[in-house]
C-alpha cells in the first residue's frame, strides 16, 4: 500500500511580488495541484499551504482565488501550531531574522528568501540556531536552478573552459521613479532604514552564484551609488532614497583546483537594458567562453574563436554574436524556484540537510556587508572564513 506524507507549509509574505509570483503561484500551487510528488521509496508527499500576512483582505482574497483552505494574519499562532511543518518567509528583510529565529526555536523547518538577516552577526546566529535545533533549513538560491546557469555549470563540469580566467556579470534594468509611471519594485527597496539597497539585496545572490559556478570568493572591492536620489512610493508620495540603487563589484575568486579567477559584476536599478536578458554572466577560459542568462546559454570554443583586428577606420563587417553556438538543455528544465522547493521538501521528509542552508546565506550577508565596507573605506577587503 502506498504511504502518504502530508507536509503543511506556512507561507509568510506572499502578497509581495516574488513571494506571490514565484513561490506561491509557480512553485507551491503547481506542486499541490499535481498531487504532490513521489519519493524514491514510493511515498507520496502532498502539500498543504497556509497563507500568512499582515493584510487580512489581501490574504483572504488570495486564499479564495487559489482555493487555499487556511490563512492567518497571526504569524505567532502559526509558528506555534504543532501541525505546521515548515515556515517560509518572503517578507521584508528587516523582519526576517526574528521570524526565522522564532520558527526554528519552535522546531519548525524553514525555507527563506535572502538576505536572511541585516547583519552578519544575526545571520551567523541563525545558522547556529538551525544547527542546534536540528531542523532542515533552506535558503532560496534560485539562480543556480535557472536553465541558463544550469547549462553554464555543466560547461564548467565538462572542462569546456580549460583554465577559467574571469567571470563578468551585468544585472539590472530601469526602475521607474514613481512620479509619472509607477515603480515596479517596492519603495522600501530604496530606504536604507527599511533594509533596502542594491548591495544588501544582490550581493547575497552573487555570492552563491560565484560559489556555485566558479568557487570561493576571497575578496571584494565595491563602489556603490544612489543614482536616483528622489522617488515616489506606492501612494504617490515623494520620498528620499537613502539606499544605494547601484553597486559595482570586483571579486577575487578561487576554483576548487586552486586557480585564481577575477569576477566583476555591475548591478543597477538605473540602467536601460541592451542585452538579451535582465542578467547575463560571461565566463572566459583558455579553451572557450560562454555567456548565460536566465534561460539561454551560448558558447564559443577556442577552435571557433575569430581573430579580429583593431581598425577604427573601417566599419565592422562581421557579426560577432553569430559566431557563438547555443548550448542545448538536453533535459526538461522546470521553473528554478519550483525545482529548489521540490528538492527542499524532499530533504525535509527525509530528515536531512538542504545543500543551500543558513551558512551559505551567512556568507552572502558577509559579502554584502564587506562590499559596503569596501565602498566606505575605498579599498579591497579580504573575506574571512565563517565558522560556527
Curated annotation (Swiss-Prot):
Induction per UniProt is: Is induced by D-xylose. No significant levels of expression can detected when the cells are grown on various other sugars such as L-xylose, L-arabinose, D-galactose, D-tagatose and D-glucose.
Its EC number(s): 1.1.1.179
This protein's pathway reads:
Carbohydrate metabolism; D-xylose degradation
The protein's enzyme class: oxidoreductase
**One Gene Ontology MF term:** NADP binding
The UniProt similarity line reads: Belongs to the Gfo/Idh/MocA family.
- UniProt subunit comment: Homotetramer.
Question: What job does this protein perform?
Answer: Catalyzes the NADP(+)-dependent oxidation of D-xylose. Is able to use both NADP(+) and NAD(+); however, the enzyme shows a very strong preference for NADP(+). Is likely involved in the first step of the oxidative D-xylose degradation pathway.
Q: Specify the protein name.
A: D-xylose dehydrogenase
Taxonomic lineage of this organism?
Answer: Bacteria, Bacillati, Actinomycetota, Actinomycetes, Micrococcales
GN (gene name): xdh
Amino acid at each position: 500500500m502506498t504511504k502518504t506524507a502530508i507536509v503543511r507549509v506556512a507561507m509568510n509574505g506572499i502578497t509581495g511580488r516574488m513571494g506571490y509570483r514565484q513561490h506561491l503561484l509557480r512553485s507551491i500551487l503547481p506542486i499541490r495541484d499535481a498531487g504532490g510528488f513521489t519519493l524514491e521509496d514510493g511515498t507520496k508527499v502532498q502539500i498543504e499551504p497556509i497563507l500568512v500576512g499582515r493584510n487580512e483582505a489581501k490574504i483572504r482574497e488570495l486564499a479564495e482565488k487559489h482555493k487555499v483552505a487556511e490563512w492567518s494574519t497571526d504569524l505567532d499562532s502559526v509558528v506555534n501550531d504543532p501541525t505546521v511543518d515548515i515556515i517560509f518567509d518572503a517578507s521584508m528583510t528587516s523582519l526576517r531574522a526574528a521570524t526565522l529565529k522564532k520558527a526554528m526555536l519552535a522546531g519548525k523547518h524553514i525555507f527563506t528568501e535572502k538576505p536572511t538577516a541585516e547583519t552578519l552577526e544575526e545571520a551567523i546566529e541563525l545558522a547556529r540556531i538551525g544547527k542546534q535545533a536540528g531542523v532542515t533549513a533552506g535558503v532560496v538560491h534560485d539562480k543556480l536552478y535557472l536553465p541558463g546557469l544550469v547549462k553554464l555549470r555543466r560547461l564548467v563540469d565538462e572542462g569546456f573552459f580549460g583554465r577559467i580566467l574571469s567571470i563578468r556579470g551585468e544585472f539590472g534594468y530601469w526602475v521607474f521613479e514613481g512620479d509619472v509611471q509607477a515603480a515596479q519594485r517596492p519603495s522600501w527597496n530604496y530606504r536604507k532604514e527599511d533594509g533596502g539597497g542594491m548591495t544588501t539585496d544582490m550581493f547575497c545572490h552573487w555570492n552563491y552564484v560565484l560559489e556555485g559556478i566558479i568557487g570561493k570568493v576571497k575578496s571584494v572591492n565595491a563602489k556603490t551609488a544612489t543614482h536616483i536620489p528622489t522617488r515616489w512610493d506606492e501612494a504617490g508620495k515623494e520620498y528620499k532614497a537613502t539606499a544605494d540603487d547601484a553597486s559595482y563589484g570586483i571579486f577575487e575568486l578561487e576554483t576548487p583546483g586552486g586557480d585564481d579567477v577575477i569576477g566583476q559584476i555591475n548591478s543597477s536599478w538605473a540602467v536601460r537594458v541592451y542585452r538579451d536578458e535582465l542578467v547575463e554572466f560571461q565566463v572566459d577560459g583558455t579553451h572557450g567562453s560562454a555567456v548565460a542568462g536566465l534561460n539561454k546559454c551560448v558558447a564559443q570554443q577556442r577552435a571557433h574563436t575569430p581573430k579580429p583586428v583593431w581598425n577604427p577606420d573601417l566599419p565592422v563587417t562581421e557579426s560577432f554574436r553569430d559566431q557563438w553556438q547555443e548550448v542545448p538543455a538536453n533535459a526538461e528544465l522546470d521553473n528554478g524556484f519550483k525545482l529548489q522547493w521540490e528538492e527542499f521538501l524532499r530533504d525535509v521528509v527525509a530528515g536531512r540537510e538542504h545543500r543551500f542552508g543558513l551558512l551559505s546565506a551567512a556568507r552572502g550577508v558577509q559579502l554584502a556587508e564587506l562590499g559596503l565596507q569596501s565602498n566606505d573605506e575605498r579599498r579591497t577587503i579580504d573575506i574571512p572564513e565563517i565558522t560556527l
